[in-house]
Structures are given as C-alpha cells and as structure tokens.
Amino acid sequence: MSFFCVKHLSAGYSRKMILQNVSFSLEPGAVTGILGANGSGKTTLLKAICGILPHEGLCLLDDTKLEALPPRELAKRVSYIPQRSGISIDISALDVVLMGFNPRLKLLEHPTKAMIAAAGEALSRVGMADKAHTNYLHLSEGQKQLCILARTIVSGSRLLLLDEPESALDFQHRYRMLEMIRSWTEQMSGGAVITLHDPVLALNYCDRLMLLENGEILDILSPKEDPIEKMEQALSRIYGPVSLQLCKTRSGKEVLTMLKEDEP
C-alpha cells in the first residue's frame, strides 16, 4: 500500500512549465530514483513536492495533503537535501545536524542532551564523528553532504528528497551514502525520492526508476524485476544506445552495470 502519492503534478518557473502531469507512488521502505537529462525536470519535481515551488496537483503523505500543511509541520514530515546546502555562516558540523530538530523545538528552546547525543551518533553513522566540532564551511563538499544526511537522520521525517547526493562524493562514499539511505527507509518505514546522475548507482540501489524527459514520465522501471531488454530500451531513450550486464562481485552479490554502445 502506498504511503506517498503524487497526482497530476505540474510545475514550472514564471510562465514556463517544466513538469507536465506527473503521477507516481511510493511504498513504505522503498527508494525511487529519478533519471533524466539536464533540464528534464528532476530538481523541479523535488522542489515542488517539498513546497519550495508552487505547483498544480496533489502530494499525499499518509493521506495528508502536503500542500495544506504549514511549513513547520511539513518540515517534520519531509526532508529535502539540495545539491548545495546554502549554509554560509560559521557553525560547527554538530550544530548543523542539530538543525534537524528545529521543527520539533519551540521558539528559543535549546536542544536537549538526548538530542545532542543523537546528533553525535548520526555523525558517527555517516563517518563524520571526528568532524563534529569542525567549522561546517571548512568541510569538503562531500563532507557537507554527509553532514546534511546526518541532519536528516535525526529529523524524524518519513519522506526524504535528495537532489544528486552522489555528485560531490568520492567512489567509496557514494555507495556508503546509498546504503545508509536504504537502511534509513527500512528502519523508518519511510521512503526516499532521489535524483541521480549515475545510472549504475540507480540501477543497484533503487527499487524503482522514474525516467523523465521534457518534464514527462517516459517510463517507470523495477530493476530487480524487469527484463534487461526492457530496461535497455527505456534507458537508451535518455542515454543513447546502452547495454546492461549482470555481474557478480567476489562476495557473490549480483550487480548491474551499464555500457555505452556505438551509435548506429
């Protein structure tokens, strides 16, 4: 049964519509990846869902209309991680994580000892325990992304929206972040919608893949269930001719790889 549903969503900037009549649903514990060329509407979709961008249509979370929620209540339910955090003040990494509790604190109320401990544990989970008291502005872009993920972990939100979270991360941390997101969705019985630049990551870590082109859904794939031929045909509409190969790691885990084929 779906716990998050988008119905007939259209959005754009000024008078230019970017998204046209987008509808999809998300099951508890699932991760949906969004793939598409630049300008296809991936970021616009996330901004519309989290209320940053005005839109037509409905976004329902546990049958609650997100458009009707005050910003504070919306922030309790939905966490959005953009490509760049926008934080430009001198503040420690730990204090950034503590921002995840802000929607649950009253005006002028300070985080409790339990909240501070939880923030420290979240930093440890993302491999940033030794950076707790480091100035956030002095962190690398990848470390900043991990710090923001830790903030999301403590927020208690059930829906996570991420805009190309792997773009600033090295090879090792890309996989670590996706594994943590999967773990988070399962533990919270929540869900994640992620725009991704790397289709191989998407194929191996997402339960479903939404392919966008010019603001419309081309196809929705299930990498663990769909035939390779079907996925190749769909992905080729975005990336040009591609082939998918099912490989095994040394530990025996099956993974999908994608290769670019020559143009006919």
Language model regions located:
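Conserved ABC transporter NBD signature motif
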Residues: 57-65, 74
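Conserved ABC ATPase "signature" region
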Residues: 113-131
